[in-house]
A protein has these predicted regions:
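Short secondary-structure boundary motifs at beta->alpha junctions and helix caps
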Residues: 118-186
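Bacterial N-terminal signal peptides
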Residues: 7-18
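Positively charged n-region of N-terminal signal peptides that target proteins for export
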Residues: 1-7
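Surface-exposed short loop/turn segments
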Residues: 83-140
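A structural "domain/chain start" motif
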Residues: 17-76, 146-148, 156-157, 161, ...
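A short, well-structured beta->alpha microelement
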Residues: 70-90
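Short regulatory "switch" loops immediately downstream of catalytic or recognition motifs
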Residues: 65-69, 106-112, 153-155
Length: 204
């Protein structure tokens, strides 16, 4: 399978995110706790792709030293359950907790004719995702990010199912990484002070 990968992202965001990631890599202790929640997607996205989207999100966040997903046995209550013990443990460890969800906003898949002179058909796949984080236990919106990616690959009829699955995984992984980079960058930025508040401080 020959693959041509392209990713659509704002250059400024990508550059800033890479700088941020390099800076945070030296952090010794995590600052955030996360739980991944069910992937949101339309009927055009099959269960296998949704399952991989959750795996990709979890793997991406777990690879970042400032994020943790395990703070001890029995302290991982899900939304709708009693999360008082989880909230207390997060406060004790000085961690900010978030429920993180992937939403697959758009998903397009198209089989194209072979290139001139070629024999293999081409599979084109595009996806746009958003990653949203809400606070634990308040469930208030804390951050979000978007990512968009696509792949066009030559596929053999005999391996169509396997090649389609692999293309889908690559698209999801790349789009989610973009979205998480953007979301984490926003989370790291200091909160802006309202204009009225800044004026009061100057007068004081």
């Amino acid at each position: 399978m020959k693959t041509c990968l392209f990713a659509i992202a704002a250059l400024a965001v990508a550059t800033s995110a890479s700088v941020y990631t390099a800076h945070e890599a030296v952090a010794a202790e995590p600052k955030y706790y996360f739980q991944t929640q069910d992937v949101k997607a339309g009927p055009e996205v099959d269960a296998a792709l949704k399952a991989y989207a959750m795996e990709a999100l979890k793997a991406d966040l777990a690879a970042r030293p400032e994020w943790a997903s395990d703070i001890g046995p029995g302290i991982s209550a899900r939304p709708g359950e009693d999360r008082s013990a989880l909230a207390a443990e997060l406060k004790k460890r000085n961690l900010r907790g978030f429920d993180v969800t992937v939403r697959i906003e758009t998903f397009k898949k198209e089989m194209k004719d072979p290139k001139p002179g070629g024999r293999l058909k081409r599979l084109a796949m595009e996806m746009k995702v958003s990653v949203v984080g809400t606070t634990i236990p308040e469930a208030k919106l804390a951050f979000n990010g978007t990512g968009e990616a696509g792949i066009e690959a030559e596929v053999a009829e005999a391996r169509l199912a396997a090649d389609t699955a692999n293309v889908g995984k690559e698209v999801i992984k790349d789009a989610i990484k973009q979205a998480v980079d953007q979301a984490v960058l926003k989370l790291s930025m200091p909160k802006s002070v309202p204009v009225n508040e800044s004026r009061k401080k100057k007068k004081g």
